[in-house]
Amino acid sequence: RDFPRPQLPVIPLGVDCAKFAPDAGTRARQRAALNIGDDDIAVLYLGRLSFHAKAHPLPMYLALERAARETGKRLHLIQAGWFANDFIEQAFRDGAKDFCPGVTAHFLDGRRAETRFAVWQAADIFTSLSDNIQESFGLTPIEAMAAGLPSVVSDWDGYRDTVEHEVHGYRIATLAPPAGQGADLADTHAGEIDTYDRYCGYASQFIAVDVAAAAAAYGALIRDADLRRRLGAAA
């Protein structure tokens, strides 16, 4: 008697889409609370706020500043997440002031469940320019799709499998040294000379996100409400 081979499908991380469904009332309240006007554009980053172990914010700051200048639109950058310590928080706040002074910066506590879900409603665009080797699947682009938002993300790891370029949003060219060039970093981590935290931070300094391409992607979405709707609906 033959024994039927069991099905063993691989099911990726998922989200409860109903929690992210667009709601006009919630959107109006969230935008009013943040003083985001009807004609303003809000760009959302959600996740850990860590320049060495998640995503260095400099490419995002520079690209949004350029997009704000080129489009003439009033832009808001919502960074909803959490900091590991006060030093990192101050670095993010100072960086926003120094590198995107023309963009209104909002920092929200993403550890609060009510914030983590409602803040999606305030946004017009989602972004995550991750540059870190610890980034694997990446759940937030899936949440952005559930919220009906177009995405601007780095061309990185799991993001490549979820965000189809010019269909759901834009994947921004992200460069790393050739294979094998990180052997010294791997050796110091494997030999317990460097912690995993330091290993991630050191490795991230060799990654470059194309700021000009990111600015162009932001600009295209900022200028064109129909494009935002079309890419958001495709997700």
Where are these regions (language model features)?
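Donor nucleotide-sugar binding/catalytic pocket of nucleotide-sugar-dependent glycosyltransferases
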Residues: 1-25
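Conserved catalytic-core segment of nucleotide-activated headgroup transferases in glycan assembly
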Residues: 16-110
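Short alpha-helical donor nucleotide-sugar binding micro-motif in glycosyltransferases
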Residues: 110-113, 118-123
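C-terminal "capping" alpha-helix adjacent to the active site of nucleotide-linked donor transferases
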Residues: 176-229
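Short glycine/serine-rich donor-binding loops of glycosyltransferases
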Residues: 138-141, 159
